[in-house]
Regions:
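Short acidic/polar hinge/loop motifs at secondary-structure boundaries
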Residues: 1-18
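Predominantly transmembrane beta-strands of Gram-negative outer membrane beta-barrel pores used
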Residues: 15-26, 32-40, 47-91, 98-106, ...
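Face-selective signature of the C-terminal outer-membrane beta-barrel domain
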Residues: 104-122, 143-285, 354, 358-361, ...
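Structural signature of Gram-negative outer-membrane beta-barrels, strongest in the C-terminal barrel
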Residues: 118, 215-219, 223, 243-370, ...
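Surface-exposed extracellular loop regions of Gram-negative outer-membrane beta-barrel proteins
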Residues: 129-134, 230-235, 304-346, 366-390, ...
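Outer membrane beta-barrel strand-and-loop segments of large Gram-negative receptors
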Residues: 196-198, 202-206, 246-256, 335, ...
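Gram-negative outer-membrane beta-barrel transporters
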Residues: 263-265, 366-368, 389-469
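C-terminal beta-signal and adjacent terminal beta-strands/loops
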Residues: 370, 422, 466-489, 505-509, ...
Length: 585
């Protein structure tokens, strides 16, 4: 969704459906979760606008109508985080621009056309003026990053009594460029350690028909996709430079059918569906029956307050393009043996609610993963890589890894309209591959948030986040100290023979926000103060080993020379205040 700052303006969202299981059959490529959000329609009666000026960004949005049959909404946002980050003394300076729009027009009483688009531009440069050991380490490996992404699509919908047909054509694009020089000295190309440009594009055409038959709803549809992935990389690997080019084209297809049922008294509901997908990457993936994806869910109200629910499903997802498009030195796609990744999910839940004001729920879940890509070089799952800047998947892989995740999630929601709302969730879980903790095995996640509306249009809100420490792999000091190895990537190498044998401490963060609104004739002015991590909590990472730049054995052959290393304490977290002004008119 755009990294730590979402690319989508939340003010424009009408509704969000978040699935962690029981995925709808009309959504492909889901293994972990599905975030399905729908934008509001523009205002058919009047034009409204909103401008926001904050400590880190400025934005402008609006919605209204172009004619009696056509409505619009839009949003554009520009950050100046680089100024804030420089003032805080951080070694990297991010900047982003994002925007979105939606046009909807009624062609007739039974036909409508919707066009929407999203765009995001990210640029991150380095603050080489920042001094200190922590900044020195981050600057030693972090590249400059330029990234552009956009999605544009059009949807035609025809209403025919009990039937609704939808035709959708969309295209998404991602252009990523990373550049890194040794010691950040770009005065000579001899200092270049990384120049990467990768482009991912996907064009999708889909048809869907929905039929309502009393208590039943039927859905069926099909889609075709064309994907293109290119990568042009020049990278230093130990003593030599590697030039890597790849160009991957994939044609894929899929179909689905699902049915939903709700009893006349609304106490029982059920959903069942099946989906299959295929593509022309290899023979295994062409065979649709090998990716048959059934799913089933039900819910039953035991009483007016108690409800029981459950779901089960087998889901598939294509491995990342970096893995599918990886070539060897002879230009041959070396990962042609990969398969669709799969997960078998089951869940059982119970919830209690008092009207719409108070709800308590608990759900147990089990996810069993199979056919996951395994790194031949490091003997760890590909899914456990990529929690830092860099490219993941450009290596030899085999589809043999298995894993599982299981746990229980509880939630409490309490709200009194116009006065306050309170939401909390606690998830206790384990995530493992071959009975070894995965990179995501934090054991627990607690989130508590609330907003209170005070008199005279004041409101105050807070959010507490508490997460268990993740496992980590110690560094390989012997390999990292080699001059050629260190100069190649400017950071230490992991000792994967000790994969995830250590664990970080837990971390908690508390955020506070205060809002005040003033209403005038045809205008609303709002002020806010937002303080993230008000307690100044520190997120601790494993101590990092770093080159001092001093060679211990300068007379040894170049391949045996070693840097004298030092350890740096790694922790992050600062109080981040922000103040802003919002105007609606």
């Amino acid at each position: 969704s755009g990294g730590p700052v979402s690319i989508v303006n939340a003010d424009l969202i009408r509704e969000i459906s978040f699935y962690t299981g029981a995925f709808p059959a009309d959504r492909s490529g889901a293994m972990s979760s599905v975030l399905d959000f729908r934008l509001r329609d523009g205002n058919p009666d009047k034009q409204t606008y909103k401008a926001t000026l904050g400590a880190s960004e400025v934005s402008f949005s609006g919605n209204g109508h172009l004619s009696d049959k056509t409505t619009y909404l839009f949003s554009i946002r520009q950050s100046y985080l680089q100024l804030l980050f420089k003032a805080l003394g951080l070694p990297f300076l991010p900047n982003f621009i994002d925007g979105q729009f939606k046009l909807k027009t009624k062609l007739s009483a039974h036909d409508e056309l919707t066009v929407l688009g999203l765009v995001g531009i990210d640029k991150m440069k380095l603050n080489t003026d920042e001094k200190g050991e922590d900044a020195e380490y981050i600057l030693s490996y972090l590249p400059t990053i330029h990234q552009e992404t956009f999605t544009i699509g059009a949807s035609y919908r025809h209403y025919a009594g009990k039937h609704v047909q939808t035709l959708t054509l969309s295209h998404n694009y991602l252009n990523n460029r990373n550049v890194k020089y040794l010691n950040n000295d770009d005065s000579s190309e001899d200092n270049l350690t990384l120049r990467l440009r990768s482009v991912e594009q996907k064009t999708t055409f889909r048809f869907e028909n929905r039929t309502r038959l009393g208590q039943w709803t039927l859905k069926e549809g099909a889609e075709v996709n064309y994907s293109n992935y290119t990568n042009r990389t020049k990278q230093r690997i130990l003593s030599s430079s590697s030039i890597y080019h790849t160009d991957l084209n994939i044609f894929s297809w899929g179909g689905f059918f699902s049915t939903d049922y709700i009893s006349t008294n609304k106490r029982f509901s059920a959903s069942a569906g099946i989906r299959t997908d295929g593509n022309n990457y290899n023979q295994e993936m062409k065979e649709l029956w090998k990716q048959l994806s059934p799913r089933f869910s039900l819910s039953y109200d035991l009483t007016k307050q108690w409800a029981l629910s459950g779901s089960a499903g087998l889901y598939y997802q294509l491995p990342p393009y970096t893995a599918l498009g990886f070539k060897d030195n002879d230009g041959i796609y070396i990962n042609k043996n990969l398969k669709y990744m799969q997960v078998l999910e089951t869940s059982l839940g119970l919830d209690w609610h008092l009207e719409d004001r108070l709800m308590i729920s608990a759900e147990g879940f089990l996810k069993q993963y199979g056919r996951m890509p395994l790194s031949v070089r490091d003997n760890i799952p590909l899914a456990c890589k990529g929690d830092d800047y860099g490219t993941v998947g450009n290596e030899v892989l085999i589809p043999t890894e298995r894993g599982r995740a299981y746990g229980i999630e509880t939630m409490l929601r309490w709200q009194v309209p116009g006065q306050f709302n309170f939401v909390s969730s606690l998830t206790l879980f384990r995530s493992e591959f071959r009975d070894i903790p995965s990179a995501w095995d934090n054991r627990f996640i607690l989130n508590v948030s609330g907003t209170f509306n005070l008199s005279r249009r004041w409101s105050i809100g807070g959010k507490l986040s508490y997460i268990g420490g993740a496992p980590y792999t110690p560094y390989d000091e012997d390999k990292s100290s080699l001059v050629e190895a260190w100069n190649a990537q400017g950071r230490p190498y992991y000792d994967y023979s000790k994969y995830n044998t250590e664990r970080l401490p837990n971390f908690a963060q508390f955020d506070v926000r205060i809002d005040k609104s003033f209403y005038f004739h045809r205008c609303m002015v709002g002020f806010y103060i937002d303080i993230q991590n008000i307690t100044g909590s520190k997120l601790k990472q494993q101590d990092v080993i770093m080159s001092t730049g001093v060679i211990e054995n300068p007379s040894a052959p170049i391949g045996e020379q070693r840097y004298k290393m030092k350890y740096l304490k790694q922790e992050s977290g600062t109080v981040l205040p922000s103040i802003g002004l919002t105007v609606e008119f």
